[in-house]
Amino acid sequence: MPELGSLLLSTQAVAAPGELLNLALHAGTVGPEAAVLVAMIATLLVDLAGEKVSVRWVPPICYAGLGSALVLLALQWNAPLEPSFLGAFLSDHLAIAFRAVVALSTLLSLLISWRYAEQSGTPVGEYAAILLAATLGGMLLCGATDLVSVFVSLETLSVASYLLSGYMKRDARSSEAALKYLLVGSAAAAVFLYGASLLYGLSGSTSLEVIGNALVTSPTPLAALALVFVLATVAFKIAAVPFHQWTPDVYEGSPTPVVAFLSVGSKAAGFALALRLLVGCFGSFDTQWKLLFTVLAILSMTLGNVVALAQTSMKRMLAYSSIGQAGFVMIGLVCGTEDGFAAMVLYMATYLFMNLGAFACIILFSIRTGSDRISDYAGLYQKDPLITLGLSLCLLSLGGIPPMLGFFGKIYLFFAGWADHQYVLVVVGLVTSVISIYYYIGVIKMMVVKEPQEASEVVKAYPPINWSTMGLPPLRVALVLCVLVTAVGGILSNPLFEWASSTVAGTPLLQQAIATSSGASLG
């Protein structure tokens, strides 16, 4: 992307001195993040007025902030590409798409959070403010193009995630989850800093573009060591095997709405980071990191889906499922082709709705029964057809059953992998998809097939449904929206893939990598 740096310099050369700072910053680029920041500050101020005021005003403030962020992101889609903050942030199409996924995942997570927070006695204002802080870090991470901005945004996301994981202070499992997450996350941050220091020493710059150019001209063993450290950090963030050990315990112990955000928003930011660092910095080590990611993808798909078979907790099952889903997304990353990158973007967008829809059903069941055990879902169809239908459709979509949206997301990934001769990845993906269908359908069978007399004791004591209870209408909106998109979105798979392809086309970083890869293949 040499044209980006020259764009900034040439623009500055013709500007008046008083305008140089504004031209160098291009602060309007981070307008969506500013909207989230204003909403976060407003929730903290409202929280000072007491819990009653918070319960009334915090939700609309969050909706306004996140809604404004999504609108501003849409307006940026066809805007001229300008590096901002002295080249530390770039709002290309890749950044816009992944920032939208992060913001939308937060919005849906908040919709399914209010009733859960009220029932558990969680202060609404503090919870929303910390979740918005995590969102801010995730969105900035998606567009960060400098080691300093990468680290600051990564730690903003991470520290807020630690706080969210341990937010249920009276729950020993939540505290344990937060401690494990903190220890492993701190180690990952230290590893990243060491890798970043090596990159700075090799290039004399913190700019990812400059670092990438320096590594092309003089690849060294130290650069390979830096690649290992950076790859370990990325693998931790996306919960890829063998850096996944924290995931099941954190998912099981954390508040369920927090898990919903971590499974989508945090993972999306992690994949955006992977693209920025691996494709942007380590183009000269393309063969090496793709080989490593091939191994990680195979391990993640295999272990995630096989271990999920033995789980008795719904959240632990979805934790291992998310590890397997990360393996599927890595197929697109390893391909490095236009179709591969587009399929990767598309699958993250589809994963947003089908996974959050599943978590909305789990939260609703937990609110009414206090249970997370899979066996307690037996016979649920007799008592709550809405949860049964919603959870069934979302699980079928996660398994890749046609005509659900998840089927088209996976099929595009497999097509891209096959076209790029990644036959082993595609075969492993197909086999592990079949395995995942087995445990997803096992849950559906338990809910639907069981006779009334075979229903679990929890379902037999299922309370009457009252949707007018405070906090339940937003949850119902999120549930219905996710289920509808998951079930009907398959009809729109071609327009969605065209949108994902335009995301790749509007990202100079990916276009340069595709051109380089094509040139090497022809050579």
From Swiss-Prot:
Q: Which UniProt keywords apply?
A: Membrane, NAD, NADP, Plastoquinone, Quinone, Thylakoid, Translocase, Transmembrane, Transmembrane helix, Transport
Compartment(s):
Cellular thylakoid membrane
Q: From the record, give the transmembrane residue ranges.
A: 30-50, 57-77, 94-114, 128-148, 182-202, 223-243, 255-275, 291-311, 317-337, 345-365, 389-409, 424-444, 477-497
Q: Which InterPro entries match?
A: NADH-Q_OxRdtase_suN/2, ND/Mrp_TM
Provide one Gene Ontology biological process annotation.
ATP synthesis coupled electron transport
Q: Which reaction does it catalyse?
A: a plastoquinone + NADH + (n+1) H(+)(in) = a plastoquinol + NAD(+) + n H(+)(out); a plastoquinone + NADPH + (n+1) H(+)(in) = a plastoquinol + NADP(+) + n H(+)(out)
- What's the domain of life for this entry? Bacteria
Which is a Gene Ontology cellular component entry for this protein? Answer: plasma membrane-derived thylakoid membrane
**Care to name a GO molecular-function term for this sequence?**
quinone binding
Q: How does it sit in the membrane?
A: Multi-pass membrane protein
Its EC number(s): 7.1.1.-
Q: What does this protein do?
A: NDH-1 shuttles electrons from an unknown electron donor, via FMN and iron-sulfur (Fe-S) centers, to quinones in the respiratory and/or the photosynthetic chain. The immediate electron acceptor for the enzyme in this species is believed to be plastoquinone. Couples the redox reaction to proton translocation, and thus conserves the redox energy in a proton gradient. Cyanobacterial NDH-1 also plays a role in inorganic carbon-concentration.
**Per the similarity annotation, which family is this?**
Belongs to the complex I subunit 2 family.
Q: How does it assemble?
A: NDH-1 can be composed of about 15 different subunits; different subcomplexes with different compositions have been identified which probably have different functions.
Please give the PANTHER family that the UniProt record associates with this protein: NADH DEHYDROGENASE
Record-given protein name: NAD(P)H-quinone oxidoreductase subunit 2
Gene assigned in the entry: ndhB
